[in-house]
Amino acid sequence: MKRILTAALLLLTGVFASAQQMPPMPVDPAVRIGHLENGLTYYVRHNAEPEGQANFYIAQKVGSILENDDQRGLAHFLEHMCFNGTEHFPGNGIIKYCESIGVKFGADLNAYTSIDETVYNIDNVPVAN
């Protein structure tokens, strides 16, 4: 009886282990993929809707999982700091610029940090200019 249970357990372990391996997700052929010198990989896909607008997502493979116990909240803090100015957009310059072209802070310009990713999104950006 013990041998039968051991064999059944080994069989089930093998079945569950093989079931967890998923094939890679196919890439949409309409997506253009490129790599910058700094290591950033980008994906571009044309969408007809919404007409005259574009949406941008910057996804980074960093999140709270990379924090030590004495760093809790650091990933989320750094996400917020990205809206507090850069060399070319000091202070709230990036927010002011986006609002000047019709992008609303909070609704169209936002970000989030999760366990394993930090994502910045800029939606409804007019592309006429």
What is the role of each PLM region?
Residues L10-S18:
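Hydrophobic h-region of N-terminal signal peptides that target proteins for export
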Residues L5-A7, A19-K96, N121-N124:
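His/Glu-rich zincin catalytic helix
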Residues I4-L5, T13:
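N-terminal targeting leader peptides, primarily classical Sec-type signal peptides for secretion
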Residues T86-E87, G91-N129:
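Acidic/histidine-enriched segments that form metal/cofactor-coordinating
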